[in-house]
Amino acid sequence: MNQGQGDGQAQGQGGPATVAPRVRMITVRALLVIAAALVALLLGARHGWAFVLGIALFVLGILISVILHEAGHFLTAKSFGMKATQFFVGFGPTLWSTVRGETEYGVKALPFGAFVRITGMTTLDEVDPADEPRSMRNKPAWQRAIVMVAGSFMHFALAFVLLLILAIGIGQANDNTTTIGSVSPCVPASLKAFDQGSCTHSQGAAPAKAAGIKPGDKIIAIDGKPVHNWVQLGTAIRAQPAGQPMAVTVERDGQELTLHAVPATVPGRNGSYLGIGDAVIFTRSNPIAAVAFAGSAFGQVLTGSAEAVAKLPAALPDLFARDRAKTPAANVSSMVGAADIAGQAVASSGGWRYTVSDLLLILISINIFLGAVNLLPLLPMDGGHLAVIFYERIRAWLARLRGKPDPGLVDLQKLIPVSVGVFALLIGLGVLLMAADIFNPVHLVQ
């Protein structure tokens, strides 16, 4: 590093040793900007700029979530005197970095996450003898456990705060209704037109409009089968074969009417299309009620996520089925699918409350899901390291009972095959979900 005054002056004047890295970094930044611009142009041309904005907001939200996750590890490690040498956002080539104290902070080229480097996090890490007393592996088990849990805690805390913001600032959406809030004037001619709500070059009047369905109507049955909420209604519509008339029983001004609609299809979209939107009423909560709502909603999302993941193996064939939306477990999405839904939410014409509510709910669900999955006792996730810590303590306790010395830390070298297997399984599942989200996406509206 220290190459003398002469070299320092030459490099300061733009010598080859300095110019080459700068040129490479400028090239990397330029390529990233060009790539991002091309992706935005392609998405904008196909789905509209509102859709692109939704994806951008989603990516920003996820990036903030991941940064907070790593900040949880970083702050708890520092509070216990552990040495943290790096805190970076992104992966790949470094775009910018600065050193503050003993830690290097920076941004890398690929914004797909973040990482913290804590000295001696595992027995596999090489540590300078001078830093060994401050290494994570030399700290008490309870401190190491707190550091490992801190990442998921940040996900849960962020989700809870977003739920409070949703309840107090936006309001709770009462979508447990079948009342019509809007009727589309047309059948969109393409998936792009569908996402934008555009009627340019349409395929004619929407089935709901042609049948005489009006905003304010409450749909109570489809083909004589009662529907009690919007989910049931959407499932019934999507299951109806396009072109086949169906009886829609509505309640209007206290009277029941039976109207007949012929569902249509939108090119590139799965399921039949009726052209209706629900009437959602948003009710704001006071702070006390908001806390109760946040706790209840948190538990519901956590339980729902666990059930969906448990049922996912059996639902894998339904990922590519035409009626994917009918199987809740098959609605589990990759980040690609979640970004697509965020884009749809912003591109929809349901109003700003609906848009913000949908975006917040997406981020809330993902943070709760990530926080829970990350605590599963499987390496290389945080829960796997936590399980190893518990195993070490149980093993040490049993050794004391037998009058033997503490066996010490677990040799993680022996667990590498397990980590590789779990990692490969997660990658495979992620690729499968991503393929389903690309070729058989989930849509928000009916």
Which residue ranges define each predicted feature?
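Small-residue-rich helix-interface/hinge motifs
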Residues: 2-7, 12-14, 50-130, 370-400
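Topogenic membrane-insertion module of multi-pass membrane proteins
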Residues: 2-48, 52
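Functional transmembrane alpha-helices
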Residues: 12-19, 134-135, 139-141, 182-189, ...
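Long, highly hydrophobic alpha-helical transmembrane signal-anchor segments
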Residues: 33-81, 333-365, 437, 446
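Internal alpha-helical transmembrane segments
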Residues: 67-68, 79, 112-190, 417-421
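Terminal peptide-recognition signature
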Residues: 69, 107, 208, 216-219, ...
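Conserved PDZ fold ligand-binding element
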Residues: 197-200, 205-231
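PDZ-domain C-terminal substructure recognizer with occasional recognition of PDZ-binding tails
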Residues: 214, 220-222, 234-277
